[in-house]
Amino acid sequence: AGFDKNAEVYNALFRLGFGFVEVGTITPLKQYGNSKPRVFRLVEEEALINRLGFNNHGAKTVLDRIKSNKKLGLLGINVGPNKDSDNRLNDYLIGLRAFHEVADYITINISSPNTENLRNFHEESKLQELLTSILKEKNDLKSNVPIVVKISPDIDENQINLISEILLENEI
């Protein structure tokens, strides 16, 4: 996720030989993302800083694009909430509803430091509430699409262990 934010080049990536491609992060509504500049290169550290902020065309546009371009391989769809959403949990459910029939898996993105308070979903009670809602919606949709949860790369080992336990308890 992050390279093909709007599902515009996933088949070209498959033709290059990738075994799977993940598009997104896709939010329910189109969103510009953070103000530019939002990508910074640190030459001496050989690193990049990304402050994109889930810029994307929105679920409907991306879904229409995927439906009109038959995928040539395993396609994951990374979903997240709109920056100004009043109900972020519901935004994830909107993403699941939109993409469960066209995705080979759906990634629930709770990792972005660029979306205020998104990392609150790393907390035990909030993560459990999110997963319970996702699994209930998946059951209501009679969907078998696998769920992946993208967590932050800079959390400590205790948080990783706690999140891992919750994911395993929920069979994710």
Region annotations inferred by a language model:
Residues 1-172:
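Flavin-dependent oxidoreductase catalytic cores
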